[in-house]
C-alpha cells in the first residue's frame, strides 16, 4: 500500500550554562571582533537514542574536538556569534539556513553522505549583562515541491546481519553493496542497493527529517525508480522502507530546520546567567571586561596579565594612596597592600576616597584595605600599621623601630612595585634605598600647592636618577618646629588625583614589553596646575646620591638595622658615606676661592 512518507523533527538542543561561560571567555580573549564561523562539537551515542529526536548537547568543552571513541560519533557544527544584537536580529534566518543547506548538499555530492548532517548556532553575547541570545538549526533540505512515498515497509530485527554489521561502523550513514556495509561516498551511492541510516526517531514508520537530505543527494547522484533505506534504531522499531521520490520540476532547494523555542514558536532563545552566577565572580569578570576590550581593536598587544599579576605596595594611605589604589584596581591589579602609621582624621574623608565619617579615629591602612575589599571582593589587600624609620629622626624606641624596619623590608621583598606616597621627604629615604637594594620598581609621587612630581626610580640598567639624585644634602628632620600650614599637605584638591593617575599610568606603561603599545615611559612627569601644563624629563643618576650611592646600598646590605639606626641618629653619616660631604667641602672651598680678594684689590666702577 502506497502512503506518504512523514518526517519527525530532527533534533533538540540542550545548552549547558558552562557553554556560555566558555563563550564569554573566548569572545573576550580569543574571538574579540572576529565573527567568522567557529567549529562546535557534540558526541552522539549511537546506541542510546531514547527520544524521538537527536539530542545536541553543548557544554564548555564543545569548542574543542573530542578524541575518537568507538562507541560515539562526533557531530561537527558551527557557531556564528554576532558582534551586536542588531546584527543578530537582522540576520535573514531563511536565507541563512538555505545557504547552509546548499553547503551541506554540496558536501554530500562531493565527499561523504555523513557530511550532510550538521548543526548551526547563531548567537549574540551581551557580556556586560551576562545575557545570551541564540538559535540553533539542523538543516534538512529537499527539492522544492518534492514528495516522498513509501511503497513497502518491513521490520528489521535487532540481531539481523545488517544491524550487527552496521553497529560496528562508527558512522550515521552507510551504503550496502553486494550485502556488505561500505562508506557512503558519491561513487558508492551510484551503485549501492540500499542506504543504512542510524535514525534519531522512534516513531513507527516515521523517520527523522534529515532523511530528506539523504534522499535528495542520493537521487541527484543516482536517479532510479525506488530508493531503499534501512532505518536502524536502538529499540525494536527499526524498519526498511522502499521509497519513491518525485522531485518535481523546480530545481531550487527548500530548507527547514530551525528549532522552536520553549513556547513552541519559531523564534530565538535567550538565557540570563546573572541570576545564576556568584556576584563576586560577576564583579571579577566585569572588572576585566573593559580592560580586555582594549585588546580587541585599540591595543591588541597590551600585556594585561603582567599588570594583573603585579603586587603593589603603597607606602602612605592618605590622599595619594587612596587614589592610586583605585586606579590600580581599575587596571585589574589584584594584590594591593597599604602601609601607614596614622589614623583617619575628621579632615580626611572629603579628600581621601576610601574613608567615611564613621572611620575617623581608626587605623588608616587597615580601613583602606577593608574599603578596597568592599569595592572589589576579589582583591587581595592587607593593611599594615607601622612607622617608617626616618633619616635624621633619632631613635627613641629601638625595639619597635627595628621591628618596623624589618617588617618594611619584608614587605618590599614580597612586592613588585613600591609607591612612595608619604608627606615627609625623609620618610622616602629608607624605602628608596631598600627598593634599590632589592631591585624593585619604585614610583614616587609628591605634591606641591599647585604642582606635582611623578617619577620612577632608576636601576643599574637604565642609570636614571631617583628622588634624591638632585640633592647635595641628605634629608633630615623637616617636621620639628613647623607651623600647622607647613606640617599639613596644603595643595589644590585636584592635584592629588592628577598625580595618582599619572603614577599608575607610568607604572602600567613601564610594565609593557617593547615595542611599547602604550607609548613612551618617561622618567619623570612634572605637572603645573597654574599653567595646566605637564613636562616630561629625564635625569641621570648621581654617583653621590644619598639613596642610590653604591656605598650606601652596600652598607645597608651588610649591616642592616645597625646602619639604619646610625642614619636615623645622624644623617651626616650618610653624606660622608655617599661622598656628599666631600662635594659640599669642595663647593665651599671653590666659593671661598672666588671671593678671596687681597687687601690691595680694588673694584673699578664707572
Swiss-Prot record:
Region (Homodimerization): 567-606
Null allele phenotype: Impairs the formation of preautophagosomal structures.
Compartments where found: Cytoplasm; Preautophagosomal structure
Superkingdom of this protein's organism: Eukaryota
Gene Ontology annotations for the cellular component aspect, listed alphabetically: phagophore assembly site
Motif GXGXXG motif: positions: 316-321
MF (Gene Ontology): Atg12 activating enzyme activity; Atg8 activating enzyme activity
UniProt-annotated catalytic positions: 488 (glycyl thioester intermediate)
Further comment found in the protein's record: Kluyveromyces marxianus proteins are shorter in length and have a more ordered secondary structure than their S.cerevisiae counterparts, which might contribute to the superior thermotolerance and solubility. K.marxianus could be therefore useful as a new model organism for further elucidation of the molecular details of autophagy.
Domain notes: The C-terminal residues 567 to 606 are required for homodimerization, as well as the interactions with ATG3, ATG8 and ATG12; and the C-terminal 17 residues are required for the ATG8 lipidation.
Designated name of the protein: Ubiquitin-like modifier-activating enzyme ATG7
Organism: Kluyveromyces marxianus (strain DMKU3-1042 / BCC 29191 / NBRC 104275) (Yeast)
Organism lineage string: Eukaryota, Fungi, Dikarya, Ascomycota, Saccharomycotina
